[in-house]
């Protein structure tokens, strides 16, 4: 069987390397978040919601999806799960009855407060070598501009 690729192998393919790094990082974060009864995606959306509220934003599922750059349908499903767990509350917007507002419950806020430092510690350890490279963060930011 012949092999044709622009790259000499998997270790020179940026997409494959990013995939592997992402999988490794997500495994570490997922393992740490299990003790908080959160998946990685639940943590990201819950933390994003808390961040947005702390910065004076009214949070809707649409705004949360945009902020976290995730699919609105996935956000809807995850928010439903977070609501069942008692971490998020949904309510109708008094100014626009079609719009659903999101807020954290006390326990949801406590989950973020407890889990965030642990996830940040994992991030610091996992990305330490790459952060020494001058353009690592700006390179990631540049990738997100072209979506």
Swiss-Prot record:
It comes from the Bacteria. Residues 11-147 form the HTH marR-type domain. Residues 61-84 bind DNA. GO terms for molecular function: DNA binding; DNA-binding transcription factor activity. SUPFAM superfamilies: Winged helix' DNA-binding domain. InterPro entries: HTH_MarR-typ, MarR/SlyA-like, WH-like_DNA-bd_sf, WH_DNA-bd_sf. The keyword DNA-binding applies. Keywords: DNA-binding, Transcription, Transcription regulation. GO terms for biological process: regulation of DNA-templated transcription; response to stress. PANTHER family: TRANSCRIPTIONAL REGULATOR SLYA, TRANSCRIPTIONAL REGULATOR, MARR FAMILY. This is Uncharacterized HTH-type transcriptional regulator YdcH. It comes from Bacillus subtilis (strain 168).
